[in-house]
């Protein structure tokens, strides 16, 4: 069992405002006393007993920490330190203070495909790095893509929250991971073996949302959403996509493929002509998209 720093985190950090929370985790802004530097402290509630359903299991916490310790990339969040007390494991993480990508885009009245691809290239670069290490994130969605600083012409993004991430070991199958219904791949819905391909599906959903503000598979209920995902039941509605380029739609179509083996890989995505145009004019001719963001 991995042992984390048992000292009192309050001796080393002043904690401030809450930045966000999940089922068993709370993230707060904090300041390191010795340096004055600001970080984000993620307090993960530990599961008391193996039979308990409250809190996060030791195995899951150690897996998240192990993955965070391994990664170092401009588009991925960085781990600073890990503390532990009787009730929580506390991850001291890089502070990503610019808010969610989704909220940033929701504030803009319109965005070009060129602007959307500026963000997507960063997401793809981050995922390329993770996949090169055989790490699947399994929870890619707009809420887990944060801006470092929203008040610059071309904001930099960071992929956050590795609570569901796994190392994909060949011969070692995962089936039981579950993220947010709108973004999960059909193989997750159908409890089939999972791999890096599941992230590529999620990138397809994110791309659809960035260009339209609409969610491709969202139904009135969780069950309806999952049924839509499993059946790959989506369309490019004229209301949202009448001015979207054929290349952008092709990019999405090649990701929202039911068979994981026929889906674009991260390498394919980076080489797709919408992301890597053969000539500049091809990129500049991309039409305006007018999103109507609905959370």
Segments predicted by a language model, with ranges:
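Protein kinase glycine-rich loop
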Residues: 16-23, 27
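Conserved N-lobe beta3->alphaC-helix segment of eukaryotic protein kinase catalytic domains
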Residues: 44-71
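Activation-segment/catalytic-loop signature of the eukaryotic protein kinase fold
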Residues: 82
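Activation segment signature within eukaryotic-like protein kinase domains
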Residues: 119-120
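Glycine-rich ATP phosphate-binding loop
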Residues: 26-48
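Conserved short submotifs of the Hanks-type protein kinase catalytic core
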Residues: 87-100
């Amino acid at each position: 069992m991995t042992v984390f720093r048992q000292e009192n985190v309050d001796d080393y950090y002043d904690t401030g405002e809450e930045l966000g929370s999940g089922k068993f985790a709370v993230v707060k802004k904090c300041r390191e006393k010795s340096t004055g530097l600001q970080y984000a402290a993620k307090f993960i509630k530990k599961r008391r007993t193996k039979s308990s359903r409250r809190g996060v299991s030791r195995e899951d916490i150690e897996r998240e920490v192990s993955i965070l310790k391994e990664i170092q990339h401009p588009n991925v969040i960085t781990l600073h330190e890990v503390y532990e007390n009787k009730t929580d494991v506390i991850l001291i993480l890089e502070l990503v203070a610019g808010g969610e990508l989704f909220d940033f885009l929701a504030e803009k009245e319109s965005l070009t495909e060129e602007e959307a691809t500026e963000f997507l290239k960063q997401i793809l670069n981050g995922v390329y790095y993770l996949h090169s290490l055989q790490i699947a994130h399994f929870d890619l969605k707009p809420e887990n893509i944060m801006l470092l600083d929203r008040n610059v012409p071309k904001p930099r993004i960071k992929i956050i929250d590795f609570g569901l991430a796994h190392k994909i070991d060949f011969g070692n199958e995962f089936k039981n991971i579950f993220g947010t219904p709108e973004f999960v791949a059909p193989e997750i819905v159908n409890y089939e073996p999972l791999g890096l391909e599941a992230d590529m599906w999620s990138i397809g959903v994110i791309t659809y949302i960035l260009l339209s503000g609409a969610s491709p598979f969202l139904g009135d209920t969780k069950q309806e959403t999952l049924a839509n995902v499993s059946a790959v039941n989506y369309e490019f509605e004229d209301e949202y996509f009448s001015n979207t380029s054929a290349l952008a739609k092709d990019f999405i179509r090649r990701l929202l493929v039911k068979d994981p083996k026929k889906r674009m890989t991260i390498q394919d995505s980076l080489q797709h002509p919408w992301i890597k145009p053969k000539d500049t004019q091809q990129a500049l001719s991309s039409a305006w998209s007018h999103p109507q963001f609905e959370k």
